[in-house]
């Protein structure tokens, strides 16, 4: 990191001019509340704990009204970047979505999300096979984020190396009505209509949005439409119902990744092989869910049912992939949150059905070729049961323990039998324990935990057999993780500080690793064993009611300990930087609100052999807006934003172990945007 970049990053934590701070703060600011650990129930662990008392690393981040209205929020990276322990890669096109990893878990994913359980408004986006697609999530309406950084299979089973719980609204509340428009560099445009209120006995919240871009890179044009909402009501003094709906439709081009030489010479170019077949994605997804809570007096019984339908056409240079997916599930939980002994019991069931067809080629128009290479029906069945107990040994000391049993069955019905019937099954089972303790120090909390996670290969990973063909890859098995952590969180009220720190070690056996063959197809195997050691720290200083300074540090050492290829032993796990520093300063004064943020990332490896690296960078973003100008019953909230202020050339994402050294997915140069909210 150059001296200039380091100096710029350091200035982010320096106060703005004292004359600004000396002016009167906005009357809506609350001074004392900023430095207290909130008693927020952590829904990401099925309401078993609160943020202040949890015996594991968890962050609950509630986005302020100013952040929701006055920042661009076009990508989940904008929402998740301030959180420690999570690594988000933004590809800056719609075809593949963000690449998300928590403590190194999920690093192998080059499309979708692996290894991290994701829920949106209480409904799982993670499928029974362990993969998640976040297309339906509109970052512009996400109001609260819960991130459990510890392995959490005891609560959610398959693919729970961490838990990400996203909420567009809080139960029983509805945001103001607003129309929002935003335009910016590279043909970016976004429109949003959002509103809510009471409709008879219902409290409702709904939104609809459209987004399009020409894109910084060639062949990255696309559009997407989203809609969703929640509705809740009481069915009696002890019973509450909440319904959730979300939908997405998109049509986008895919520029693919570049070699280092291409990245250095012209990062805006696209891979010619993808342009030649008009590679991209056309998809739609709809999901619906409902949760019913009933208070039994000292205990709560909760039941949830949900369903999802996703349709995909995916033209690529080596194949044209088409599938229709149906998925759904139920969960039932009984929990007790009073008394010396607390805890819960639950059962889950899930079903996933993928009707998959792969054509062996794609035409220059982006349509499927004539020959079918794979035609099969893939079914995933998942059943599980779990229990969790918390024993409050004293007023300050609590002990916790949990256990979950899962069984998952994958079935492939081969409907293309010219080369023989390759139908097959894979069945996996797991027992996931956890134990922990927490100690209340008065102003903070000490905690320690041992927890576990397991992660099966997904249906698409099993169907990507080396050499092609139907059925499932019989050589790749689940990976299993054991996690150890200690930490502390709390406040220093006199100094108006809030802090959070944790040390952890993950031991990963039978690590599922991805590599790309010559045609560009992802193929998977078990690498062997990794260790992930790390530290995470957060500090937030509410200097005045109108000035907040925050710092986040994530340090890690992820090492390949065992491998079938002995030359890889001792190498660093690719795709994840060893350090990440995030800083921001927020100022609110006389109706104006501004944020200056920065993220520093060193170079990091892009392949298992550690022979190639993504370049280091410092990313600085600036936003300025007004919190409300009243005009004839309407409130106007304008804003402007500058991203990549330093005009860095960097890779927003990487493709781990890509064939031919095509690791790099470039991010845009300096860009500008402006928007307006009209609120009533």
Residue spans for each PLM region:
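Periplasmic plug
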Residues: 99-149
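N-terminal periplasmic "start-of-domain" segments of outer-membrane beta-barrel proteins
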Residues: 38-71, 96-101, 116
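Transmembrane beta-barrel wall of Gram-negative outer-membrane proteins
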Residues: 183-212, 217-255, 279-298, 328, ...
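A beta-strand signature from Gram-negative outer-membrane beta-barrel systems
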Residues: 127, 136-180
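Gram-negative outer-membrane beta-barrel transporters
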Residues: 337, 394-399, 407, 498-507, ...
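Signature of Gram-negative outer-membrane beta-barrel scaffolds
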Residues: 344-441, 456, 565
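Membrane-embedded beta-barrel scaffold of Gram-negative outer-membrane proteins
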Residues: 296, 300-314, 440-451, 477-533, ...
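Conserved C-terminal beta-signal and adjacent last beta-strands/turns
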Residues: 219, 234-235, 389, 448, ...
């Amino acid at each position: 990191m150059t001296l200039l970049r380091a100096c710029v990053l350091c200035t982010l934590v320096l106060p703005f001019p004292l004359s600004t701070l000396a002016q009167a703060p906005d009357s809506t600011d609350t001074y004392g509340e900023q430095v207290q650990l909130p008693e927020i129930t952590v829904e990401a662990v099925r309401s078993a704990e609160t943020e202040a008392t949890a015996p594991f690393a968890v962050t609950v981040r509630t986005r302020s009204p100013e952040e929701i209205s006055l920042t661009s929020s076009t990508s989940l990276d904008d929402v998740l970047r301030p959180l420690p322990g999570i690594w988000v890669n933004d590809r800056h096109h719609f075809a593949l979505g963000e690449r998300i990893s928590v403590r190194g878990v999920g690093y192998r994913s080059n499309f979708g999300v692996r290894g991290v359980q994701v829920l949106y408004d209480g409904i799982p986006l993670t499928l029974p096979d362990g993969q998640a697609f976040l297309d339906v999530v509109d970052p512009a309406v996400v109001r609260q984020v819960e991130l459990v950084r510890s392995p959490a299979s005891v609560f959610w089973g398959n693919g729970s190396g961490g838990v990400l719980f996203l909420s567009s609204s809080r139960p029983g509340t509805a945001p103001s009505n607003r129309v929002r428009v935003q335009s910016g560099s590279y043909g970016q445009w976004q429109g949003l209509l959002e509103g809510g209120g009471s409709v008879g006995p219902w409290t409702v919240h709904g939104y609809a949005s459209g987004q399009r871009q020409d894109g910084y890179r060639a062949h990255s044009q696309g559009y997407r439409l989203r809609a969703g909402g929640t509705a809740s009501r009481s069915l009696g003094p002890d019973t509450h119902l909440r319904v959730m709906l979300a939908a997405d439709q998109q049509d986008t081009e895919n520029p693919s990744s570049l070699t280092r030489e291409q990245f250095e010479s012209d990062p805006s170019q696209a891979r010619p092989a993808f342009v030649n077949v008009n590679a991209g994605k056309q998809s739609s997804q709809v999901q619906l869910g409902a949760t019913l809570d009933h208070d039994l007096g000292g205990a709560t019984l909760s039941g949830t049912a949900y369903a999802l339908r996703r349709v995909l056409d995916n033209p690529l240079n080596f194949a044209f992939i088409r599938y229709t997916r149906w998925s759904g599930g139920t969960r039932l939980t009984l929990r007790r949150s009073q008394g010396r002994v607390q805890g819960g019991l639950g059962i889950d069931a899930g079903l996933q059905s993928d009707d998959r067809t792969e054509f062996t080629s794609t035409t220059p128009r982006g349509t499927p070729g004539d020959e079918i290479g794979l035609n099969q029906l893939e079914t995933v069945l998942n059943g599980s049961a779990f229990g969790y107990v918390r024993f409050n040994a004293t007023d300050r000391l609590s002990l916790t323990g949990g256990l979950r049993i899962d069984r998952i069955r994958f079935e492939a019905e081969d409907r293309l039998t010219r080369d023989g019937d390759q139908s097959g099954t894979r069945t996996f089972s797991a027992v996931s324990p956890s134990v922990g303790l927490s100690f209340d120090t008065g102003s903070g909390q000490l905690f320690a935990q041992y927890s576990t996670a397991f992660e099966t290969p997904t249906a698409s990973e099993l169907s990507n057999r080396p050499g092609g063909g139907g059925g499932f890859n019989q050589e790749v098995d689940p990976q299993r993780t054991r996690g150890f952590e200690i930490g502390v969180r709390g406040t220093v009220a006199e100094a108006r500080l809030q802090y959070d720190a944790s040390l952890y070690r993950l031991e990963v056996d039978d690590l599922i690793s991805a590599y790309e063959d010559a045609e560009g197809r992802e193929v998977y195997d078990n690498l062997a064993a990794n260790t992930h050691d790390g530290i995470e720290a957060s500090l937030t200083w509410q200097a005045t009611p109108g000035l907040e300074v925050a710092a986040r540090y994530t340090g890690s050492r992820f090492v390949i300990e065992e491998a079938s290829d002995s030359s890889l032993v001792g190498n660093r796990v690719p795709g994840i930087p060893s350090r990440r520093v995030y800083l921001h300063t927020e100022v609110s004064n006389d109706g104006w609100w501004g944020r200056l943020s920065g993220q520093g990332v060193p170079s990091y490896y892009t392949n298992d052999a550690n022979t190639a690296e993504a370049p280091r960078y410092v990313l600085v973003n600036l936003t300025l807006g007004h919190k409300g100008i009243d005009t004839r019953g309407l409130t106007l909230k304008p804003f402007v934003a500058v991203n990549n202020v330093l005009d860095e050339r960097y890779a927003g994402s990487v493709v781990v172990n890509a064939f031919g050294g095509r690791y790099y997915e470039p991010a845009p140069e300096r860009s500008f945007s402006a928007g307006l909210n009209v609120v009533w």
